[in-house]
């Protein structure tokens, strides 16, 4: 399965499918969309209003990756369901953390 993240020289780029008002804050795994694009499914309780859901996704990713929230930035898709986040840090270590979080 193709991974929804890409290593960068200064971190990691992660493609996320957001589920706002999802009842809980969690990373739920990888999904391959109908167009073949792999995405990391992230569910948050926050509503998609005034950037609240984006901030909640940023916090969920930061916690899951064990990095400060300031290291996670929204690169694209502020109002879209599929978003692109950049995470600053050691890309290899961050990718390993996502892999461990999702399991085999």
Curated annotation (Swiss-Prot):
Pfam families: DUF167
InterPro entries to which the protein is assigned, alphabetical: DUF167 (IPR003746), YggU-like_sf (IPR036591)
Top-level taxon in the UniProt lineage: Bacteria
Family from the record: Belongs to the UPF0235 family.
Name the UniProt record assigns to this protein: UPF0235 protein M446_3939
Species this chain originates from: Methylobacterium sp. (strain 4-46)
């Amino acid at each position: 399965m193709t991974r929804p993240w890409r290593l960068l020289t200064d971190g990691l780029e992660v493609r996320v499918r957001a589920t706002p008002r999802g009842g809980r804050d969690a990373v739920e795994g990888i999904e391959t969309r109908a167009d073949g694009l792999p995405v990391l499914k992230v569910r948050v309780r926050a509503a998609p209003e005034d950037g609240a859901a984006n901030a909640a996704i940023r916090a969920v990713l930061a916690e899951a990756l064990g990095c400060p929230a300031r290291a996670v930035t929204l690169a694209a898709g502020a109002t879209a369901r599929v978003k692109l986040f950049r995470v600053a840090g050691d890309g290899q270590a961050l990718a390993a953390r996502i892999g461990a979080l999702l399991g085999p």
